[in-house]
Amino acid sequence: MPANFTEGSFDSSGTGQTLDSSPVACTETVTFTEVVEGKEWGSFYYSFKTEQLITLWVLFVFTIVGNSVVLFSTWRRKKKSRMTFFVTQLAITDSFTGLVNILTDINWRFTGDFTAPDLVCRVVRYLQVVLLYASTYVLVSLSIDRYHAIVYPMKFLQGEKQARVLIVIAWSLSFLFSIPTLIIFGKRTLSNGEVQCWALWPDDSYWTPYMTIVAFLVYFIPLTIISIMYGIVIRTIWIKSKTYETVISNCSDGKLCSSYNRGLISKAKIKAIKYSIIIILAFICCWSPYFLFDILDNFNLLPDTQERFYASVIIQNLPALNSAINPLIYCVFSSSISFPCREQRSQDSRMTFRERTERHEMQILSKPEFI
């Protein structure tokens, strides 16, 4: 969905917005242009057409190629951990984002108008919003899974179905919360002659409650849950790292403390937590400007200037960047935490007591938590 949702007409001076409060039919024309200081800048879909097409094509290629590499990498793994399962789910979501959201936007920017039938308009908008929710809720599921892995490790090992249940819930909520999109959006003719797949509001005032609800469901509530989960995880790791020093000091070299094996955290799990946190930070960096701009814009807190219109064009493409960045993060972390067995055997004789202890812990886990 575009960052700038304004559809009302501006007066000639560009100082205010004149809205018709009476209900309109789905086919009524509306203005879809920005007027800044008396100059018309055109619609979002025609402005900076070449620049937007180049940007979207680059994002599309990086998204599809990058996530294809991730999916191939996880498919080749003989031992698939729960972390690998979530990485796969995230890559699938990002791949569909590239095919449905980015590729559709490329076609839309190229034609300028929406040339498909009204039904296609509604379905495309619905799928775009589904992926919007899913990309966030998969991260929420990942944070809950990491919380159980660190805080309740023994229950975590016994609950193999939890990961799949979390993903099913994430996708189910995504499809459910996106249903209003089928009613809200439709194909309509704008007053400047363009035909767009746009909201069928009677006037712009409906955008404010709609975008507020979407922002909370897609961003603020999930981000709160994620922050709480990882806050507890980081605190647990810090406490157990202190316990580690006490346990090691009471163990003579060559012995393994069973209490350590049961209670402390492997390097692989900590690496997985670091990967997860970086993924979350990338999500925040790409999506925060989008929702912040939309909220300020819909509450009329931004000036009607040329700069605001330029910002809306740039910010609109930031969410797509998230799907292109995630595979790069995976590649960085996977190369640093995946060790061939041959190298482990050659280094076995040079292992310290701490390294032998951690290796023993990994052997007693039914599914080691590496990416």
From Swiss-Prot:
The record lists glycosylation at 4
PROSITE patterns given in the database record? G_PROTEIN_RECEP_F1_1, G_PROTEIN_RECEP_F1_2
Quote the InterPro entries the UniProt record gives. Answer: GPCR_Rhodpsn, GPCR_Rhodpsn_7TM, NPS_rcpt, Vasoprsn_rcpt
Q: Listed disulfide bonds for this chain?
A: 121-197
Spans traversing the lipid bilayer: 53-73, 83-103, 124-144, 165-185, 213-233, 276-296, 313-333
Name any GO cellular component annotation: cytoplasm
Q: Which Pfam families match?
A: 7tm_1 (PF00001)
Instruction: List the Gene3D superfamilies hit by this protein, alphabetically.
Output: Rhodopsin 7-helix transmembrane proteins
* Any one GO molecular function term: vasopressin receptor activity
**Which disease is reported for it?**
Asthma-related traits 2: Asthma-related traits include clinical symptoms of asthma, such as coughing, wheezing, dyspnea, bronchial hyperresponsiveness as assessed by methacholine challenge test, serum IgE levels, atopy and atopic dermatitis.
Q: What is this protein called?
A: Neuropeptide S receptor
